[in-house]
């Protein structure tokens, strides 16, 4: 059973035409991008693709979740904290699926503290909550 939102804080609106070889624009005009399949999938690879957008969204959201739990735990996140995200796409029995990998870099933090932040962030991050039990997600500390 899906978890219902208690309250809507924000709604993103994007209009897409053409699918993987198309164009996406947000209603506020801040997102205005062309899409092409990557070369590895037979495309031109001259523009971004849904997997790159998912990787960007998940990594940005996950860093926000790390900062959120760090604030609760009174831990200062280093200014050079970063996440390297990768999203794989491939066949599954019923069509196609994705898998995500996030490598979190929290330089200067004790490894146990950093891992605790990653684990806690994975419980509150909206992308983690959306993907949990649906796709393979690999989280690691750099």
Can you name each region flagged by the protein language model?
Residues 1-56, 63-142:
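Extended beta-strand/beta-hairpin segments
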């Amino acid at each position: 059973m899906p978890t219902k939102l208690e309250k809507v804080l924000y709604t993103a609106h994007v209009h897409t035409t053409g699918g993987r070889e198309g164009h996406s624009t947000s209603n506020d005009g801040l997102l205005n991008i062309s899409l092409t399949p990557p070369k590895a999938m037979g495309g031109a690879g001259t523009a971004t693709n849904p997997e790159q957008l998912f990787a960007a969204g998940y990594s940005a959201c996950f860093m926000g979740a790390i900062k959120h739990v760090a604030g609760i735990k009174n831990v200062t996140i280093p200014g050079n904290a970063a996440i390297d995200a990768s999203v794989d796409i491939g066949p599954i029995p019923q069509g196609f699926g994705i898998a995500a990998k996030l490598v979190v870099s929290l330089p200067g933090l004790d490894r146990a503290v950093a891992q605790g932040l990653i684990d806690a962030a994975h419980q509150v991050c909206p992308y983690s909550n959306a993907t949990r039990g649906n796709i393979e997600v690999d989280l690691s500390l750099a």
